[in-house]
């Protein structure tokens, strides 16, 4: 349980919850904004939830990475966000944004704020739509493909793809 400094609320951000959409080949994973991004990616790989394995090297919390639309090796967070639940400080209420409403751009989103500033929306929880499977997204980054010794466009097992990104 973490105390939310702006709201005077206690927010339980311990872990994530999943909703398996096996009929569609996807899984919705709901994660608290204060969870560690690297831990989420590690869990996704272990659970065989594909779509964020090439983002393993991004640092920070889930909320921070989503607000900055973290990107690496041809993947970006916006590719796997389903929705973002926030606290709207202007209306003093919770508000959920569908991915299309998040205004994702290169390393930015509706939730990004400049250093030292307060934004209107505090990210509370993010729901990701990941693929249920063992293969990575196609490797689009030439340097990563060369490091792995595979052609651009190849798909890899999730763990080796994550390990290559982390330099293991």
Regions found by a protein language model. Give the residues of each.
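Anion-binding (especially nucleotide phosphate/pyrophosphate-binding) glycine-rich loop
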Residues: 1-91
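Phosphate/pyrophosphate- and phosphate-bearing ligand-binding catalytic cores of soluble enzymes
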Residues: 94-168
């Amino acid at each position: 349980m973490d105390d939310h400094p702006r709201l005077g609320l206690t927010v339980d951000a311990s872990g994530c919850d999943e909703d398996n959409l096996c009929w569609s080949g996807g899984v919705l994973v709901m994660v608290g904004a204060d969870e560690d991004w690297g831990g989420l990616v590690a869990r996704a790989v272990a659970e065989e939830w594909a779509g964020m394995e090439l983002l393993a090297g991004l640092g920070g919390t889930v909320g921070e990475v989503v607000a900055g639309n973290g990107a690496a090796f041809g993947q970006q967070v916006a590719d796997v966000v389903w929705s973002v639940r926030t606290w709207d400080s202007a209306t003093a209420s919770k508000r959920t944004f569908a991915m299309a409403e998040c205004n994702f751009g290169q390393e930015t989103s509706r939730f990004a704020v400049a250093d030292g500033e307060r934004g209107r929306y505090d990210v509370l929880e993010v729901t990701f739509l990941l693929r249920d499977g063992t293969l990575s997204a196609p490797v689009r980054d030439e340097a990563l493909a060369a490091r792995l010794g595979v052609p651009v466009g190849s798909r890899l097992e999730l763990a080796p793809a994550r390990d290559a990104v982390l330099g293991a």
